[in-house]
Structures are given as structure tokens and as C-alpha cells.
Amino acid sequence: MFKQLSTSLLIVSACVFSACTPAVKQEIAILPTPVSLTEQSGAFVFKDEMKIGVSDQSLFPAVGYLQEILRNVVSSSVEVTADKNQVDVYFQLGNTDGKPGSYKLQSTPEFIQVEANDYSGIISAITTIRQLLPAEIEIQGVKQTYSIPAVQIEDAPRFEWRGFMLDASRHFWNKDEVKHVLDLMSLYKLNKFHWHLTDDQGWRIEIEKYPLLTEKGAWRKFNTHDRTCMARAIEEDNTDFLIPENKIRIVEGDTLYGGYYTHDDIKEIVAYAAQRGIDVIPEVDMPGHFLAAISQYPDLACDGLIGWGETFSSPICPGKDATLEFCRNVFKEVFELFPYEYVHMGGDEVEKNNWKKCPRCQKRIRTEKLSSVEELQAWFVRDMEKFFQANGKKLVGWDEVVKDGLSSDAAITWWRSWAKEALPTATAQKQKVIACPNEYFYFDYAQDQNSVKKILAFDPYADDRLSQEQKEYIWGVQANLWAEWIPTMKRIEYLIVPRMIALSEIAWAEPAAKPGLDEFYRQLVPQFKRMDIMRVNYRIPDLQGFYKVNAFIDDATVNLTCPLPGTEIRYTTDGSMPTRKSSLYNGSLKIKETTDFAFRTFRPDGSPSDVARTRYVKAPYAEAVTAPASLQPGLKAVWHNFRGNLCVDIDAAPVRGEYVVESVSIPEEVKGDIGLVITGYLEVPADGIYTFALLSDDGSTLMLDGELLGDNDGAHSPVEIIVQKALKAGLHPMEVRYFDCNGGVLQMELVNDKGEKTVLPKEWLKHE
């Protein structure tokens, strides 16, 4: 049956799988989108006594992975023979002239053949086979015959680095949980696992030379993050925020949270990842974010300077030779545990005030002929890179180290969306760049209706400052998940799916091949079916049909749609949390009075989405005001030196500058600690209901006609709210307040009846 094979097969034993009812045909919906897929007639049926062959024994783990994928189908043991005529499925390594990870897959009614030029390409093909199979293969003991359609696929990734970072410090993930994340990564062809193993809140990797790091540094009393999670579990009726009991222990009457990975744990996880074609990049963050270690070994810090500074924790003391030796010893053990050549050393968010006061740091600055504490950090990073290179490793650092004089061997993780020079600077230095700007790829950030859309629109090549040569140094893209507010795997699932699938799409598919947003959501439906069977707590797509604030004059109709079929929508109007017993939305709702709704979507298994709250406001057109004697174009912006968490407090902070702006935005001159109060008038040309989108990172508020219309306040990641108000033609007083903790995004746009957004017309904005 497979007569064109010429490569000899290795004889192995394997498990194959079968069932006994008619084959199920399914629509082909593979994500990320293949480069080329041609559907042909017929189907390959997985049956008893299948025979699997490989061209090289290095592919045995891949065959084992395929067996795991098919493990929920009734199986029988078979022997794979070298007889070419008896092979049903064949995996071949060969020179396909493709990128790393590329593959060719042909399935016919008689056989499946896969050809790739490396192991990762074979794994990519196996992942495609999994998605070609019905979602029901994920169910234990289903009595069906499973098949995949006859297809011809040629496929290759756009980027070599398709990454995901998991923070294991703020909250800890056990071996099985890490493996679950790796399984989800593999399902969508992600191949780089960045493992954030240490931070101020916990040390998670066993270092035999320094046992206190895990004996005590891996455990903590409940902190603000934990208490906030537990409070949200109650407030939001959501068990995903509960602290797992299996990560809590009682020591001398104290309740401690934590955990860590032994050397054996790490070796097991690294092997598990390797089988799935995933490289593991450990991160031991330094010289900042090191308090978990400093708390156990205080001499690592500058003498008498341990704790928290203005923003971040006390860093290590690079003026002490013993501290440098400690760092090298830690990395020696890390290097032995992780075979991948790249290791991440952090380098981000270092508060250097201690170094200015430390005699040893000042002596180091003089000895090394440095001029500042900034140069002291750069010296430390370069010193660590030399140690990495001497041990056969290459250094990866967050984008704060991009100007630290690293070699072209180093790689830069560009995370700060506002650090616009990081990408062109690193690529000009011939350093590989992993693009993960927080505005797009911080998956711990709250999700809204724009999250997936923004990811799909991201393209690091779109920076017109980059030459073609510089673009060659863009290694790929990555999502990061920081776990301060994420105590359970169910919460992880909710935050990363479907955003992880959107990430895989831009990491793998060329821009011309990517589906549009509506088509992408359509293709997500079969993915969600698979997730349902796998009991993955994905985020249900946003309900559509309303804004945060909706205006009407006489009456209104609430028309909701959910992109995901098979769900039910429950709602309340008294401010309470909707449950499965709340009113069922089963069609249009007519309202004649101002009404506050809380909507919640439920899957067939009863698991809920987050709550969507919206207000429908009945009010006549707001009267315009009489124009003052003289008005000038634009709005007045006052910058306050503000470090707080609420817009109402901005006025109390000192004023640093005043500006006139042509839009609701951050003036170019405004940097650092930002509190803005933007005032003026909005002049609308006609009576009507106007719709405004207010996007900010962090908090913002919108006052119109002296009333709070948009409340986007508080410290948060980029969040957009859309609000409406009925306005008469003419001038309406407006005020926008905004503060920034760490992000720097402010934008207000006009939304038309089709949902399209445009910048507020400049001629509408006036000030006294």
C-alpha cells in the first residue's frame, strides 16, 4: 500500500487505535492557518493493525506523542515493520528546503506521509493531524471509526520563535499544570517556553548549593495578591480565584503558600517539552526582582538596604564580589538542567537608588571607570554575558538591557510598548529580538472586545524604521502571562484561550494568509468544541449588541448576540451577579426606562463567563451651552506630577506643565509620572446620539456636560470603554482625566453607526 517509499524503516513497537462505527466527516478548520491546503477525495481511516514507520530513530518520541494524542480511542498493539508495502503512516526526515518547523503532509485513503527537515516539522505535522481529526478523539472510550480527509498540505512558520512565558513565581504551577500549558502550546504550534522561575514573591528552582532558596524562599505568607484573589472569588462568584489547598502548608502555626521544582522535576518537564518540539528557556531574573533570594541571603544586597524602594524591590549589590559569585553559581546549576543554548537573565525594572548610597557600588563604578549607576547595571549585564558565553550559553534579557553593550549573540525580549527604540536599536546591533509588547501580548491583562483583533493586527515588520536587514533579526513573537492575580490553572486557561490561538496565527501564518476577524472567530468554533471536550476553561467571546453606556430618548431594544453557539445568556437588573437561575435572555428586550443590566454567558456544562455590565440611559438631548466670548482651537491639558491610582486625586499633585492638544492624547513632552486633566468644549454639528470610545492604560474618566459619562478609572492595563450620550448641536463642556502607572496609552475616538472609529474631528475641540 505505500509503494513509493524508498527509505528503510526502523522496526519499533507502537500502539494504534480503532473503533467500530461509521467514520465522522468534519469541516477542515486548522489553526494556525496552513500555507497551502488542498482537499482531495476520500479519507484515511485510523484502524486496527495500523503500521507506523520513521526514517530515523530520533523520531521515536514524535511517534510516542502521536500515540498520546490518539490515546482516548480503543487501541491494540501492533508491530511496525520495515516492509514498505505494509506501512500506513510514515514520518521522514529529509531536506525539504524549508524553514525550521516546515513540513509536507499527504493523506490518501491508503496512507499518510509526512516529510520535514527537522524534528519540529514532524511535530507540526502531528499537530495538524490532530486538528484534522474530530474533536471527539479527546473523549475517553468513544466508539467510532476516526478518519482524516485526504489532503495535500505544505506548511511553514513565518517566525522561528513562537513563544509563551509563564510566571511561576507570583503563583506556583506544579508539574502537571506546566505540562498542561505545554500541551496547549503544542496544539497550536508554539515552540518556545519561557519559564519565569524567580522573582520577589517566590524562588521556584532548586539550587543545591544554596538550599535556603527553596527551603524558605519558595514559601510565603499570603500577600496582597493572594488576598485580592480570594476577595474576587467571593465578589465575582468565581472559584477560579481561590488559592489551591495543595499549594498551602502549615509551618509552626503559619499558613504558607508556595512550591518549587526539584532537579528531577525540571528534567522531566524539559523532556516532556522536547517531545512536543518545544525548547525551554529558564529565566532567573537579576539584578532586580531578586528579593526572594535576598531575604534568605541578605549579604547579596547592599549593606542595610533591603526591602522595597519607591517602585521596585532592592536589587543585589554588584559591588560585592561574593554577590557576583553567587549569581554565577546559580547559573551553573541552571545551565546543567536546561539544554537549550539560550537562558534569560531578566534585567528589567531595577531600582538603582541603593547603588548611589552603597560604598561598594561606588567603588565598583570608580574601579571599572564607569560614570553612573546606569552604567553599573550595564557592566553587570556584560559581566554575566561573558560568564554565559564561557559556559556555552547565550544571554536573553528584557529590553531594558538593549543599550548595555551586549554582543550580537544576545537576544532582546521587547516588552515595553512605550520603549519605541528597543526594536530598531537591537536589530541595528544585529541582536535577535522577541517581540512581546505588553499592549498586545500581556495575557494577564483584562480582555475586551478588541483583544483578539489587536493581536491579529500586530506585525513587527510594520515598523518603517527597520531596514530589510534589520527585519531579519526579528526572531518572532511571544505572549507573557504574569501571575500576580492568577492562582489557578482554570484562570490561566480563561486568560490565554483564545488569545493563544490568535498569537499562533500571527506567529505562523503570513499576513496575506491570515483570516479576517469574523472568519477567525468562525474557525474558532470547532476549536472551542475541542476545548469543551478537553474541559479547557476558555473565554467565551464577548457578547455583542451594546456599549458600556447606551443612550436612548423614548425606548430602546436590547439585541444581544454571542459568537459562540450553544450558550445561554442570563441577566439581572438589580446589580446582583447573574447565575443559572437568573432571567434567561431569549430574544429582544424592550425597555422604556433607565436600566442597569448584568449579563453572563454560560456554556452547556454550566461554567460561566465574566460578567458584562452595561447601562441604558433614557434622557433627552443635552442642551448646548452659550459660547464664551473667545474660544481657541484644541483642548487645554494640564500635566501633574502624579503617582496615584484614582483620577479624582490628580489635582492635589504639583503642576509640571500646560499644553494645548489637538486630540485627547498624551502630549509628546509628558513623561514619567503622569496625571493629566484635559478640559475644553466639544462642539457637535447636529442633534443626535453620539458614541465615544475611551482607551487608556492606566485610568481615565470622561465628563460631558458636568456629568460622569465614562468611568475607566483605576490602575489597569489597556482597557477601552464605549459610551453614548444624546447631545443637541453646539458646545458641550468636557473634561478627560488620566493617569499612568506604567503603560502610557490615552485615546478618545468617535464611533459611527457601523462601529468604525475615527479620531475626534479637530474642529469639534475648543478651549478658553
Which residue ranges define each predicted feature?
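Bacterial Sec-dependent N-terminal signal peptides
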Residues: 1-29
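Short, compositionally stereotyped local motifs that mark structural "simplifiers"
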Residues: 8, 515-638, 643-680, 689, ...
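Conserved structural position at the C-terminal beta-strand
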Residues: 601, 736-738
